[in-house]
Amino acid sequence: MSQFIAMNRFKIVPGMESEFESIWKTRNTYLEDVPGFIRFNLVKGPKREDHVLYASHTLWASEQDFEAWTKSEAFRKAHEGAGSRGHLYIGHPDFEGFTIVEGAGVG
């Protein structure tokens, strides 16, 4: 079974980067005990004229593990209150899912 990468791309209002990052740094993701979860990263991309790009990046043992998480209590808890922070975002997050075909790495 192939590993799976799940990414959400966020367009953040310029000047709101610190607030956005603080939310991610202080929240409980509830991922540690989810079957198939391997790793999480929040990454910051380029600053554009109208937004700053961020992406959440999670690595899963399989796409099935990711799908099961999206239907779980842990997912619901991790996303509580997300709708109350609309002032930070330009539009909705864009989801992208990828099956790993080939890879290399250390450790």
Labelled PLM ranges:
Residues 26-38, 59-96:
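An amphipathic, aromatic/His-enriched active-site/gating alpha helix that lines ligand/cofactor pockets
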Residues 12-20:
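Short, surface-exposed ligand-recognition loops at beta-strand->loop->(often short) alpha-helix junctions
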Residues 1-4, 41-53, 80-107:
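Glycine-rich beta-strand-turn "strand-cap" elements at beta-sheet edges
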Residues 18, 64-66, 103-105:
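Residue-level signal for secondary-structure boundary sites
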Residues 4-10, 41-72:
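Short, well-ordered beta-strand segments in beta-rich or mixed alpha/beta enzyme
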Residues 16-17, 28-29, 33, 44-47:
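Intrinsically disordered, low-complexity segments enriched in polar/charged residues with Gly/Pro
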